């Protein structure tokens, strides 16, 4: 267990005696790795994180952080972890420095170390120049970096992040992740994060687990999981999804492995052995059938394809994204 940062065994969480948020979740996270929990809204991602950070008790099963049981050794667990929730966790009518000062006192940072620790995390998160400004004047990315800075005050061994970049624009997301990967590489910090951003998980996570309806769907490295889907992808944007799927399924000679659809966007993804050979045949067949092809492209399998293969659905939280953006904007304005 010395090299294991987080371990769960048959973890179950039931709310109100009826809703099973987690259903037998077993995972292992190695020390020093960046580990992602991927899944749609309601998959159990936040429930799992709240159990691991000692905020919730599991209904059954066991969970360990750095070898400590999260239920019986909760005080010890909290000494070694930093946690950044999805919800707003700083005060907008205070300065960045004042926020960190409050958190340092809450966390019990020794008085003679407080100023040094605050200045250290401000420097690391590139917030020193803005430390005296009210947080309401910060951009969304700056606020998120400040929230991460609060979690770093205790010099944690594991950093838990619930949707660390939700609602941020691409540039702000990249800046946040530049800081997180630096923490991982320079300090050996274990990072455990929840996300539904496929690109984020593919780019930064060493390994991931996909949750759906409270269950582990699959676990592994992103490249390994994408290889498990196999083949190549022909992606078509069409005016008639139903007819396209019907025609494609009749093309037995193309080595078709799977067909996935996104009705909302009129997209059909055909997984085949050889996309370059299959594409012209598919286009000709569909045009002969009267299907209008708006766009066609070739790609490798993505984590979306992995999720479709193992969970039979897709990860989409656009409504939740807008909700979070609006809520954080309202709170920021006070």
Identify the function of each model-found stretch.
Residues 275-334:
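C-terminal coupling/interaction segments
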Residues 31, 129, 240, 272-274, ...:
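Non-catalytic surface loops within mature trypsin-like serine protease
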Residues 82, 108, 147, 230, ...:
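A generic structural signal for secondary-structure junctions
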Residues 4-6, 13-212, 217-218:
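ABC transporter nucleotide-binding domains
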Residues 178-273:
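ABC transporter nucleotide-binding domain
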Residues 13, 27, 236-238, 270-272, ...:
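Preference for bulky hydrophobic residues occupying beta-strand positions
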Residues 62, 134, 233, 260, ...:
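Residues at or immediately flanking beta-strands
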């Amino acid at each position: 267990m010395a090299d294991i940062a987080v371990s769960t065994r048959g973890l179950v969480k039931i709310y109100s005696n009826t809703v099973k948020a987690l259903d037998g979740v077993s995972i292992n996270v190695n020390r020093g790795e960046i580990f992602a929990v991927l899944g749609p809204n309601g998959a159990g991602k936040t429930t799992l994180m709240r159990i691991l950070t000692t905020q919730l008790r599991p209904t059954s099963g066991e969970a360990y952080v750095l070898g400590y049981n999260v239920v019986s050794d909760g005080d010890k667990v909290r000494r070694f972890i930093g946690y950044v929730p999805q919800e707003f966790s700083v005060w907008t009518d205070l300065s960045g420095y004042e926020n960190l000062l409050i958190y340092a006192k809450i966390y019990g940072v020794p008085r003679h170390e407080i100023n040094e620790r605050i200045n250290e995390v401000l420097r690391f998160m590139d917030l020193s120049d803005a430390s005296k400004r009210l947080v309401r004047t910060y951009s969304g990315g700056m606020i998120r970096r400040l929230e991460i800075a609060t979690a770093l005050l205790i010099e944690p061994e594991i950093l838990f992040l619930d949707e660390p970049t939700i609602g941020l624009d691409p540039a702000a997301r990249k800046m946040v992740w530049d800081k997180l990967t630096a923490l991982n590489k320079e300090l050996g910090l274990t990072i455990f994060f929840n996300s539904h951003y496929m690109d984020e998980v593919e780019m930064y996570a060493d390994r991931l687990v996909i949750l759906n309806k409270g269950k582990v769907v699959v676990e592994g490295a992103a490249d390994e999981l994408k290889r498990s889907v196999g083949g190549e992808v022909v992606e078509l944007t069409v005016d008639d999804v139903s007819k396209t799927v019907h025609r494609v399924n009749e093309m037995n000679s193309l080595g078709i492995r799977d067909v996935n659809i996104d009705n909302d966007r009129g997209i059909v993804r055909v997984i085949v052995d050889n996309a370059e050979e299959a594409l012209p045949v598919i286009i000709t067949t569909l045009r002969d059938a009267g299907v209008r092809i708006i766009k066609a492209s070739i790609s490798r399998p993505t984590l979306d394809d992995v999720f479709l293969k193992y969970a039979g659905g897709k990860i989409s939280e656009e409504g939740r994204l807008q909700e979070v953006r609006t809520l954080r904007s309202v709170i920021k304005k006070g």
